[in-house]
């Protein structure tokens, strides 16, 4: 458990390097990330490398026992490369090459880009392989499943399709290309998605996103092999995010040592209740990718803003609180972006720890306090794990398929997952967010929102889970299509209808209209966006619609199947219904939860060989009182706390539990 910073010595005069490193040491910074955007300084002329300045920086930090993560600088190739090898630049959906001088516009499949990627990564790793201060490598920066439409990508996509389908006849059949006379008769007719039209075949678009993700993964592995060969004792990761075309995270990190994530909680006022815990959701998802703790490689440090209007300045407590939020979700190292506000370039208003004035301000002193507290806690909890018995299933394929053909205004795949996650946080229940194809053996409750695409292996595991006594929650838009994004000719939820004990006889995409349902006790709840009109076969109806032509029709059901239960939610709710339903399910499964946890509080239970630790984070701008279940000793203040205590806005407490 440690705190670090992202540092850009190439932006600053040398006299600042020593001062910055010394100040970092004094306040307890343990690690810095360097060089991920510095290609033009490392190779100013093709084939001529200059590592002297980086050697000096590493030495400055090394003598102060601050460890180094080096980034491969391939996100920002130098202009000489783009000028000489324009095929290295991405082509957009209009068939135009992107403008040079902007980051992230390299093509993963360009042979020129691969050639010079290999050269710079070989040179860096050979030089720093035996440098004890360098503990690891970050590959590139914030890669995504870029939809490049250049000739290289088109040719590679054809090869990808040949490997998957063998023949054009098979592609035509699986995609249904007969629609609008879209059948291929020659491989030359297969292109990247030029035009970017939503009228393009949805099966083709889903496959192109898979290809784009695979291209990104291949580029990661291309660099990983070089680094692993030259630096076998140093870790390898890459930093991902939740912007752009999201890749298959599980493929991306399969061969890397751990996940790294760039975490920028909003500093603006949150008016949507369901977005309050959005970044807790992201962190839980990151932990679930490799089922172990992860790093934050970029963490909020100040006012965000560059190519967009600036957001609000972080309120007192936010910098420390959001760092602890990530730690409580499994982030064993939190690296803050950035040490200094840039005074040059496009990111000069994406604020860091030290302002343009170079005067230590409120954010600096809060960051220093964070470093002290994390270093203290690390002495007590040097290694920890998070063990949960509730899981939410995530699939990048589902997410992208939903984006290709939006179902109704307001209904988004990730929001469906976040709604359940938000309710579980409100109940103080820890949740794993895992790949939808994972084994479910360790869980008692599994939530599988919007299984829009149907996979036979996933279906088999879900049946096995329920048959063994697990509780499964399904939602609307389940069992709509096969994995090629083609609609199934059977009643939803298709191959899950036996265990669900229900079929969808009709549906109504209501969008932003508000309807209501009534539960067994006669309590009324609002619903929105989508209404599946359900017809039970063996399931019990536990809520009915209260509006429209389907008044009194089934809205929510539960079915006893073998040793387990399957709930089917035909509509989308506000948090009150999810909280009510999940409370009943948690009672049934004898899982602990908090009935009256104040709004905004987030709980995490950390475990190691010394016992269990409860982290409580007040994710709100109000003082909150926590009513606990166990006595505990405060790790931060080294004193015994009772079961109850108050937290300042964005405040944090860590207790060693006395059970």
From Swiss-Prot:
The identity of this protein, by name, is Beta-galactosidase BgaA
Reported pH dependence: Optimum pH is 6.0 for activities against both pNPAp and pNPGp. Stable in the range of pH 6.0-8.0.
Q: What species does this protein belong to? A: Clostridium cellulovorans (strain ATCC 35296 / DSM 3052 / OCM 3 / 743B)
User: What does the sequence similarity comment in the record state about its family?
Assistant: Belongs to the glycosyl hydrolase 42 family.
- Active-site residues are 142, 298
Alphabetical UniProt keywords:
Glycosidase, Hydrolase, Metal-binding, Zinc
Provide the residue positions that the database annotates as binding substrate.
103, 141, 307
Q: Does the keyword Metal-binding apply?
A: yes
Biological role stated in the UniProt entry: Involved in plant cell wall degradation in cooperation with cellulosome. Hydrolyzes both p-nitrophenyl-alpha-L-arabinopyranoside (pNPAp) and p-nitrophenyl-beta-D-galactopyranoside (pNPGp), with higher activity for pNPAp.
Give the reaction(s) catalysed.
Hydrolysis of terminal non-reducing beta-D-galactose residues in beta-D-galactosides
Q: Summarize the activity regulation.
A: Inhibited by Cu(2+), Hg(2+) and Zn(2+). No effect with Ca(2+), Mg(2+), Mn(2+) or excess EDTA (10 mM).
Describe its partners and assembly state. Answer: Dimer.
EC number(s) reported in the record:
3.2.1.23
Q: Which residues form a coiled coil?
A: none
InterPro entries linked: Beta_galactosidase_C, Beta_galactosidase_Trimer, Class_I_gatase-like, Glyco_hydro_42, Glyco_hydro_42_N, Glycoside_hydrolase_SF
Q: Which gene encodes it?
A: bgaA
